[in-house]
């Protein structure tokens, strides 16, 4: 089939070199901080090169991710996410079990969307800090370790690396906002508090024609419910970011070794709308959607992504940060109730995963 979607230019997301930023001083540093401020306000996202996680750790992470999703269904089911996922946010989910949505708060409306919209053709593994204390009823990752020796050791390495980078992100936020204490946010951000988590995604191969026509889907448009998202794509592509000015989605092509740092709902709320929570989705790579042609029988290659969500400690109230007393331009998601980060997380997770009737695992 020939893809007839009109050509769309990629999102103009800036590429920021964190090594250069951390080494900068004086006016050069002020320039970098201003660029970050503008990017998170306009796009809600940046590319980051030369980050602290490193190429080797990323390559290991993608290898472990693929090994996990290649496991037999029975093994993955042994660590299936519990029905009350808002209390035990860890475990594997199969195709059709979760649904991403934006601004839908009614569980009945979520059920209608599940029935009437294309299924998100992906599997996911939700992971919490392996050094943390899990509540009773949480899936036992030792069941994965039995089939993938070294899995838990790598998870410890992965969380430590992502946590280190997250703290660097938070220090930059504090510096941009003019705080004297650059660890102000980091002190409210502890991985073993069991709020911060990582998601590994496996997007199944499917005909390009289905994605281009909208009859199939990979990941619905949504914002993330954290402070910052650190996203690592493979080189397949398919991520798109909403352009509010043109009201279209623009591709965010992968850059090898780079991470994408996106503002989440919590940070938009904490900055009082100064920065924008990034509305994004996953579909076919732009070369199929907008630029070329593919035969009807062509299968879209599989896609993997690794995501780390930086999140406030669960007992912290969601309120504006120092320096953000003035109302900004963004209000991506409205919620008037004053609540803790834990209440917000439970609310969003329950809508995404919990349902009235059991899903069929594919």
Swiss-Prot record:
An MF annotation (GO) of this entry: dioxygenase activity
Cofactor: Fe(2+)
One BP annotation, GO: alkaloid metabolic process
Stated name of the protein: 2-oxoglutarate-dependent dioxygenase lolO1
Biotechnology note: Loline alkaloids show broad-spectrum anti-insect activity, and different lolines may have different biological activities. In vitro tests of NFL, NAL, NML, and semisynthetic loline derivatives with long carbon-chain acylations on the 1-amine have shown that many are effective against both fall armyworm larvae and European corn borer larvae, but the effects seem to differ depending on the modifications. N-Formylloline reduces the weight gain of fall armyworms by deterring feeding, and does not significantly affect corn borers.
InterPro entries: DIOX_N, IPNS-like_FE2OG_OXY, IPNS-like_sf, Iron_ascorbate_oxido_reductase, Oxoglu/Fe-dep_dioxygenase_dom
Keyword annotations: Alkaloid metabolism, Dioxygenase, Iron, Metal-binding, Oxidoreductase
């Amino acid at each position: 089939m020939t893809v007839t979607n009109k050509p769309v230019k990629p999102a103009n997301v800036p590429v920021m070199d964190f090594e250069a930023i951390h080494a900068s001083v004086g006016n050069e540093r002020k320039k970098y901080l201003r660029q970050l401020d503008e990017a998170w306000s306009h796009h809600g996202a940046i590319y980051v090169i030369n980050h602290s996680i490193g190429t080797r750790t990323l390559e290991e992470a993608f290898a472990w991710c693929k090994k996990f999703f290649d496991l037999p269904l029975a093994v993955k089911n042994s660590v299936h996410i519990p029905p009350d996922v808002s209390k035990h946010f860890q475990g594997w989910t199969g195709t059709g079990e979760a649904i991403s949505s934006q601004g839908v708060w009614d569980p009945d409306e979520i059920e209608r969307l599940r029935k009437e919209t294309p299924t998100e053709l992906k599997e996911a593994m939700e992971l919490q800090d392996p050094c943390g204390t899990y509540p009773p009823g949480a899936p036992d990752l030792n069941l994965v370790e039995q089939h993938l020796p070294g899995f838990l050791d790598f998870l410890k390495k992965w969380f430590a690396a992502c946590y280190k980078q997250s703290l660097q992100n938070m220090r930059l936020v504090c510096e941009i906002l003019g705080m004297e204490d650059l660890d102000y946010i980091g002190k409210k951000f502890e991985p073993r508090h069991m709020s911060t988590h990582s998601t590994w995604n496996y997007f199944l191969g499917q005909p390009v024609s289905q994605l281009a026509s909208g009859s199939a889907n990979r990941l619905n448009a949504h914002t993330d419910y954290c402070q910052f998202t650190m996203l690592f794509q493979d080189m397949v592509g398919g991520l798109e970011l909403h352009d509010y000015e043109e009201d279209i989605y623009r591709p965010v092509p992968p850059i090898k070794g780079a991470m994408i740092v996106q503002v989440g709902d919590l940070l938009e709320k904490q900055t009082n709308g100064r920065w924008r929570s990034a509305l994004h989705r996953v579909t076919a790579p732009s070369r199929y959607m907008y630029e070329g042609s593919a035969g009807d029988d062509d299968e879209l290659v599989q896609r993997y992504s690794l995501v780390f969500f930086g999140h406030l400690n669960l007992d912290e109230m969601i309120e504006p940060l120092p320096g953000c007393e003035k109302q900004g331009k963004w209000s991506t998601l409205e919620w008037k109730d004053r609540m803790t980060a834990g209440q917000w997380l439970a609310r969003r997770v329950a809508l995404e995963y919990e349902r009235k009737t059991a899903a069929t695992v594919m």
